């Protein structure tokens, strides 16, 4: 049986709009579990703190100007933390706008009962946009060609499509009009005045954590946005200007403008602002214990050799679950509130740790791979240094590979 095709068939059968495959890619599986007994058979699992998520939102709100709207970025299935599980908190906090990337994510947001503004924060194909028209997504565009394609769709379905026009003032370079060129301003005006396409927002995105760089580029954006609104006859009160991600919103307050787009800060992943703790912990358990004599090798490629007689704990997690192979011989995990060294490279479904100096370890004991246990903590910095990737590359995979258990 082709498992991927089977999953796709399930998604097709469950889609509610025409065409039937509207939300089949990317496929979002509901990994939510509601009782601890449901994670008993899992290789690993995520514990997500709804209380910390709420606290992060409230703390962020306190730093935002009263007139500035918050658009919670929930792309990549809420950074791996699960849109379905977090939307009740978003609704409770009365967040007026949610940003997503895929149609599947947009569908989950709408299914939660959210009736507010829904923005896609990446360029989408015409077919993708067409298949999600009923979800009332405000699309991101940065070229006249996109505007023409959307106008054709709007005429086909007799509706107006709302768009946010991206300018490349931030220097991200992945979408947006470059207003410094001869063609750029003409193209921007053409888009803003195109029939059947309603520009409701003008935006850019800053790629660096550098306040002075942001301020320089913000000045350019403000000038270009003002010129565009005047040249295209756009009413200022009908246009949302937005440029600020998590870092910019907190560290360059003058960039908050009409709306901010916090993502990482809500989930506790903003290196410049550690006062926002992570809402997720990554956990597994001890499967068995093994005594090895001195001189024994551990793991593929025999990268570790015991110097003395040792006791090893076999953990039910590996790189297929999002615990990278590179963690071997570098990382530590928490067992019984103490640190244990990962030895040998992590396998596909197994990781070995040395528990020779930890008393009372038993099969079934809980192991913290990331997060806190008693007075110890495995930090973001540790994970990034040992895995040799940025933290989002880890937790977005954790969320798709492991069940998620939400705690208050």
Curated annotation (Swiss-Prot):
Keywords: Disulfide bond, Isomerase, Periplasm, Pyridoxal phosphate, Signal. The modification N6-(pyridoxal phosphate)lysine is found at residue 75. Substrate binds at residues 174, 348. The keyword Disulfide bond applies. It catalyses: an L-alpha-amino acid = a D-alpha-amino acid; L-lysine = D-lysine; L-arginine = D-arginine. GO terms for cellular component: cytosol; periplasmic space. Its cofactor is pyridoxal 5'-phosphate. It is an enzyme of class 5 (isomerase). InterPro entries: Ala_racemase, Ala_racemase/Decarboxylase_C, Ala_racemase_C, Ala_racemase_N, Ala_racemase_pyridoxalP-BS, PLP-binding_barrel, Racemase_Bsr/Lyr. Belongs to the alanine racemase family. Bsr subfamily. This is Broad specificity amino-acid racemase. It comes from Vibrio vulnificus (strain CMCP6). The gene is alr.
């Amino acid at each position: 049986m082709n498992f991927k095709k089977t999953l796709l068939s399930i998604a097709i059968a469950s889609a509610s709009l025409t065409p039937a495959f509207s939300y089949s890619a990317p496929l979002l599986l509901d990994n939510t579990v509601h009782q601890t007994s449901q994670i008993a058979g899992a290789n690993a699992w995520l514990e997500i703190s709804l209380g910390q998520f709420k606290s992060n939102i409230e703390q962020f709100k306190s730093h935002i100007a009263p007139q500035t709207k918050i658009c919670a970025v929930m792309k990549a299935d809420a950074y791996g933390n699960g849109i379905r599980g977090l939307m009740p908190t978003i609704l409770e906090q009365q967040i007026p706008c949610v940003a997503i990337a895929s149609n599947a994510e947009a569908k989950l947001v709408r299914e939660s009962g959210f009736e507010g503004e829904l923005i896609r924060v990446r360029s989408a194909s015409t077919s993708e946009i067409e298949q999600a028209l009923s979800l009332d997504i405000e699309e991101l565009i940065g070229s006249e060609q996109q505007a023409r394609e959307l106008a054709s769709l709007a005429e086909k379905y007799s509706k107006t499509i709302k768009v946010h026009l991206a300018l490349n003032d931030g220097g991200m370079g992945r979408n947006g009009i470059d207003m410094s060129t001869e063609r750029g301003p003409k193209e921007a005006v053409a888009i803003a005045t195109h029939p059947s396409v309603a520009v409701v927002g003008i935006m850019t995105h800053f790629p660096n954590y550098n306040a002075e760089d942001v301020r320089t580029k913000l000045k350019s954006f403000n000038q270009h946005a003002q010129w565009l609104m005047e040249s295209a006859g756009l009413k200022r009160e009908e246009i949302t200007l937005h440029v600020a991600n998590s870092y910019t919103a907190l560290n360059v307050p003058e960039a908050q403008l009409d709306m901010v787009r916090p993502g990482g800060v809500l989930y506790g992943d903003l290196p410049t602002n550690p006062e926002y703790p992570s809402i997720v912990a990554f956990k597994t358990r001890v499967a068995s214990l093994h005594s090895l004599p001195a001189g024994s090798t551990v793991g593929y490629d025999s990268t570790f050799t015991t110097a003395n007689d040792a006791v090893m704990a076999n953990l039910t997690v590996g790189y297929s679950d999002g615990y990278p192979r590179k963690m071997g011989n570098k990382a530590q995990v928490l067992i019984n509130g103490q640190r244990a060294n990962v030895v040998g490279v992590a396998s596909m479904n197994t990781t070995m740790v040395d528990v020779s100096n930890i008393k009372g370890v038993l099969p079934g004991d809980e192991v913290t791979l990331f997060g806190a246990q008693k007075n110890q903590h495995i930090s973001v910095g540790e994970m990034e240094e040992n895995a040799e990737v940025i933290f989002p590359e880890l937790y977005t995979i954790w969320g798709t590979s492991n069940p998620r258990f939400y705690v208050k």
